[in-house]
Amino acid sequence: MKVKLLLTAITLSCLAIDVLAQVSISGKIVSADTNEPIVGANIRIDQSLSGCTTNDKGEFSISNLPDGKHVLRITHVSYTPKSITTKGGEKNLLIKLQDSFTNIGQVVVTGTGTHHRMTDSPVPVSVITAKDLSNASVTSLDEALQKLTPSFSSMTNGMGTTLSLNGLPDDYFIFLENGKRLYGDGTYARINVAKIKRIEILNGASSALYGTNAIGGVINIITDDAKNAINVSSDTRYASKGRFTQSVNADVNTGKFGSYTSYRRQQAEGWQLNPYEENSKTHELEETGKVASTGFYANTVNQKFTFDATDKLSFYARGGYYDNKTRRPYEAYDYNILHETFNYGIGTQYMISKGNYITADYYADHFSSSYCFFKDNKTYNGKAGEEQVRKRTRNHNLSIKGIFKLGGRHKLSVGTEYIVDVLKSQTDNIAKEEAYTLALFAQDEIKLLRNLQALIGVRYIYHENFKNHATPNVALMYKPGKFNFRASYAAGFRTPTLSELYATDIAKKNDRLTIGNLDLKSEKNNYFSLSAEYVHERFSVSVNAFYNNIRDMIDYNTIATGDKAMEQYGHKEVRQRDNIAEAKVHGINVSANAYLGAGFNLSGGYTHLNTQDVELGQPIDKSIKNAYNINAQWAHSWKIYRLNINLNGRFNSKRFSKSYGYAPEYQLWNLNTRHSFNLKSVIIEPGCGMENLFDYMDDRPYNSNYATLTPGRSFYISLSLKFKS
């Protein structure tokens, strides 16, 4: 009994000491040139998980810190990073940051899993900032990627939109949100652009760190979970064809507890580019009510709670819901399509000591796709008013990761991951199919010399159906002065999805049946890259050359046509997924950014690709050869008013499609303006602009391989409100 009382007394004493030792640091961050407050600056505490962002007055406050000295690291996309040492309990700090015109201090985590300035990362990572998104007035992630990076292109048809990165479709690259992989269909459609802090883009294979599907690249969306007391904002945008987006964000932080809530509503009318379509039998044009761009409405709700038990131990819980339902014209269709997703996750992070910490995360994603019939339908035996679930997928991911500094030259990342995929389909008569994957990975960042560093990693995989596999990667970076030279090699792999193994699909226009294949093998690749970069205070330029060789690529193999297909399968053509292709992609990415003075910025990028399906001697499906983008911006402030004018241009060469032939080349130009009024309690930011300045429209008959679905020249208005705490 005495022992228990003694232990209890000691525990309570330690807790009391810990509480008494807690201190706070607060202050204000301003521009060194103008003394104006800097909004959205990030402050991190060394040897701690604590941090925050400045509010609309440039103020910050970090509590629950142990007494003693602390190193504050301050970063902002428009300013040079700064570090200062403070004593515990300091109040009213005034920190001044110098302007940075070329994003020189941007911090990234993609590619290594650890924090680096972008110019210090051993693997080349490009970044799209929240400022870039706002200047371009984008409303969706796929729009942002295409407008602001020439490496991305897209193709939209009756089955939806497919993004491509450096010639490879979206089956070959993955999306992360704050470093956590997103699963399910249409992942990028669920992202609320209003919450994005930055987008980090890693070109090339990275399966060693991120697992299957990371053959072509990784896109990591970093969201803005500001740690101020209260943050409330609203973003509204309306354009022609009923294109409406409304986002509302409400964040509350009480020190230890945080709540982050966001809602987004999107909707649009459908439109035709041509009122005619080609009859598949007579090849004559006939009138149609079918639309090239389908009307829809979509809702996204996300909630996240955080709890910082100490400055070294934190927890979170998150959940989200997304739905997207088409609005097809009654006279031309029998049903609408409804996609629904809900996801949830929990996690914790514990900092053992400076540079050493452990994270544990669990994430689940539940996706369903349904036919909502408003007429009777023979193909799917649907009745008007019925809803038929065509597919359900479940993804569960449990991961544990540790990062450890070993001496002054090594930073080791090790971890394990367990994934379960589940597929159900009423239309395909799939009661339930599932598979699990177990992975172990390790990666070491090595500082060889002062200007020379290396990265070496490997991932071991055991898949329930495809057994053992290992993927290594290695990267080298030499940094003399303002130059960065990088070389890398990575092996990647992609296991066939459950849909590719089991699911079927019917193309009604040409009566074609696609069936699965249980004998599929994993796709594998080797990726090589060389890059050079020069970074100056007022301009930067980078060049990246790469080669990607993919083996056992899954494609379609026609197994029956005509009478044989009708007799055996009841369709005119039957094809099966098979490992029949080898693909090669080599290309070059060039990007440049310059501050011209007097508020003028100019940036641009160019991508050249040579893609080849080796078996067929033709380009890879949905790939393009050349693309470039240009962004010109001017900004100026007059006391409480700031004007921002942005001109954006995008050029695409012809895009290849195995089914439809080439889509024509095109270019689109957009003019955007933002007008910011920094008032006492709110920042009011109206905007207006013109999309597709030169009124380009691909008006070929319905079901053509359209270059783009733009309805022609259109105007938009927007309004952003940010309430000050």
Which ranges hold each PLM region?
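Conserved C-terminal beta-signal and adjacent last beta-strands/turns
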Residues: 6-8, 21, 251, 308, ...
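Short acidic/polar hinge/loop motifs at secondary-structure boundaries
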Residues: 61-64, 153, 180-205
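Periplasmic-side early beta-strands and strand-to-turn transitions of outer-membrane beta-barrels
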Residues: 227-229, 237, 252-337
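Outer membrane beta-barrel strand-and-loop segments of large Gram-negative receptors
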Residues: 294, 389-391, 395-401, 433, ...
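Surface-exposed extracellular loop regions of Gram-negative outer-membrane beta-barrel proteins
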Residues: 325, 368-370, 429-430, 464-469, ...
